[in-house]
C-alpha cells in the first residue's frame, strides 16, 4: 500500500511444491500462482531446469547434452557463428531480435528501457549480454544473470535470419 503496488512477484530459488515455503508464503497472506499453462501465459517462465556444471570440463558438459544439441552447437561454430560479450549499446540490437522472437513465437516482450535498467543495475557482476554474430550481423542473443554460484538463462532471442546456422545454441 505504501508504494501503491498492486502485485508483488517473488520467485525464490525453492522447489514450488516445498511445503515449508508454501506454508510461509500463504501464512503471510500471499497467493501462489500455479496455473500458468505455458510460456505464453507469463512474461517469464514459471519453472526452470538446472544443469550442474561444477568441476566438469567442456567435453563432459557437452556429453550431457542431447545429441542434436551437440550437433547444433558444433554446426554453429563450423558455419562461422561467433559469440561476443555485448555492451549496454548492444541492448538495442538484442531488443530488436527479442521483438522478432516474441512476434514469431507469440509471447510478451518487455520494453528496451527494462533491459537498460536491468543492465545498469546488474552488469557486469550479476548480468551479461552475449550476442551471436554471423558476418558481423547480430542474429541471436542471451541474457544470463548470476547470483552466488548459480547462473540463470533469463532471456534469449533469435532472428528469423540465419536460423539454419543454429545461433541460439
Give the location of each predicted region.
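Conserved acetyl-CoA-binding loop-helix of GNAT-fold acetyltransferases
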Residues: 1, 163-169
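Conserved GNAT acetyl-CoA-binding A-motif
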Residues: 3-14
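A conserved beta-strand-loop-helix scaffold within acyl/acetyltransferase catalytic domains
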Residues: 12-17, 27-164
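Extracellular disulfide-rich cysteine clusters
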Residues: 19-22
Amino acid at each position: 500500500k505504501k508504494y501503491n503496488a498492486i502485485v508483488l512477484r517473488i520467485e525464490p530459488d525453492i522447489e514450488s511444491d516445498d511445503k515449508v515455503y508454501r506454508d510461509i508464503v500463504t501464512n503471510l497472506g500471499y497467493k501462489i500462482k500455479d496455473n500458468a499453462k505455458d510460456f505464453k501465459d507469463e512474461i517469464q517462465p514459471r519453472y526452470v531446469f538446472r544443469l550442474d556444471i561444477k568441476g566438469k570440463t567442456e567435453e563432459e558438459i557437452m556429453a550431457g547434452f542431447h545429441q542434436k544439441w551437440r550437433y547444433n552447437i558444433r554446426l554453429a561454430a563450423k558455419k562461422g557463428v561467433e559469440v561476443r560479450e555485448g555492451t549496454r549499446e548492444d541492448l538495442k540490437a538484442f531488443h530488436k531480435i527479442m521483438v522478432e522472437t516474441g512476434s514469431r513465437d507469440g509471447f510478451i516482450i518487455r520494453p528496451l528501457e527494462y533491459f537498460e535498467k536491468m543492465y545498469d543495475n546488474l552488469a557486469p557482476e550479476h548480468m551479461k549480454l552475449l550476442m551471436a554474430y554471423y558476418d558481423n550481423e547480430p542474429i541471436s542473443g542471451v541474457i544470463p544473470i548470476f547470483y552466488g554460484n548459480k547462473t540463470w538463462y533469463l532471456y534469449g532471442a533469435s532472428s528469423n535470419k540465419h536460423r539454419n546456422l543454429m545461433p541460439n545454441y
